[in-house]
Amino acid sequence: MASKLLLEIVTPDRKVLSQEVDYVGAPGIEGEFGIMANHIPFLSALGVGNLYFKEGNRTHYIFVSGGFAEVGNNKVTILAEVAEKAVEIDIARAQKAQEKAKARLAKAQDRIESARAQAALQRALARLTCKDAAQKAGTTTH
């Protein structure tokens, strides 16, 4: 039995990652799910949040927003609308986006504006959380 699985993360613009890993945790729209080698095949929609993977005793973090995860034959394929490695996240930009989203939320005139501002706030917070988790884990280079 295989003990590793291949993780591939792809966006419309680029291949973000292709690497053998021990474990993958991802934000599904119904909640987080985890995948290890020899997992049963499945397909899941992705939410906004932090995908993480374990490689030996190190944990790496990648911000993802939207898309799908496909699991099968010891391979996890993430087709994400947005995927950013922790090292690529600009903290100042994410903080600015957070403040802007909070201001938009406070001024929202209807449910649509409110939902858009809430989604922007969720993305900004997830980016900041991703960067923070990677720094705490000492894996900001991935």
Curated annotation (Swiss-Prot):
Stored SUPFAM superfamilies: Epsilon subunit of F1F0-ATP synthase C-terminal domain (SSF46604), Epsilon subunit of F1F0-ATP synthase N-terminal domain (SSF51344)
Function: Produces ATP from ADP in the presence of a proton gradient across the membrane.
Keyword Transmembrane in annotation: no
Membrane protein topology class: Peripheral membrane protein
Protein name, UniProt field: ATP synthase epsilon chain
Pfam families named in the record: ATP-synt_DE, ATP-synt_DE_N
Keywords of this entry: ATP synthesis, Cell inner membrane, Cell membrane, CF(1), Hydrogen ion transport, Ion transport, Membrane, Transport
Subcellular compartments: Cell inner membrane
Organism: Maridesulfovibrio salexigens (strain ATCC 14822 / DSM 2638 / NCIMB 8403 / VKM B-1763)
Chief place of localization: membrane
GO cellular component: plasma membrane; proton-transporting ATP synthase complex
Entry similarity comment: Belongs to the ATPase epsilon chain family.
InterPro entries, alphabetized: ATP_F1_dsu/esu_C_sf, ATP_synth_F1_dsu/esu, ATP_synth_F1_dsu/esu_N, ATP_synth_F1_esu_C, ATPsynth_dsu/esu_N
Example of a GO MF term: proton-transporting ATP synthase activity, rotational mechanism
Subunit structure: F-type ATPases have 2 components, CF(1) - the catalytic core - and CF(0) - the membrane proton channel. CF(1) has five subunits: alpha(3), beta(3), gamma(1), delta(1), epsilon(1). CF(0) has three main subunits: a, b and c.
